[in-house]
């Protein structure tokens, strides 16, 4: 079965920031900034992942924690952008 959008996002963050494949290390609603998983540079890398791997353009005004601070928020943001496109 194909990975869900949330699975793909979680896998990217686990492998690139927590250096593990253990999904227990990152809950879907865990704050990426609050837990210190990513900093501003890491957030830019996540935005590049969203644009390059998920095919969604992130505008400057959309680069806010409400859209990007957890796996579930990123997935919801990407889904909302895909519906508009």
Task: Describe every region a protein language model picked out.
Residues 2-39, 47, 52-53, 57-85:
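Phosphopantetheine-dependent thiolation modules in NRPS/PKS and related acyl-activating systems
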Residues 42:
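Two-component histidine kinase catalytic core, primarily the HATPase_c
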């Amino acid at each position: 079965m194909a990975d869900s959008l949330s699975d793909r996002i979680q896998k990217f963050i686990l492998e690139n920031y927590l250096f593990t494949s253990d999904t227990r290390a990152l809950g879907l609603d865990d704050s990426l900034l609050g837990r210190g998983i990513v900093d501003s540079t890491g957030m830019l890398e996540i935005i590049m992942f969203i644009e390059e791997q998920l095919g969604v353009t992130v505008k400057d005004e959309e680069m806010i924690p409400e859209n990007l601070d957890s796996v579930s928020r990123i997935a919801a943001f990407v889904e909302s952008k895909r519906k508009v496109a």
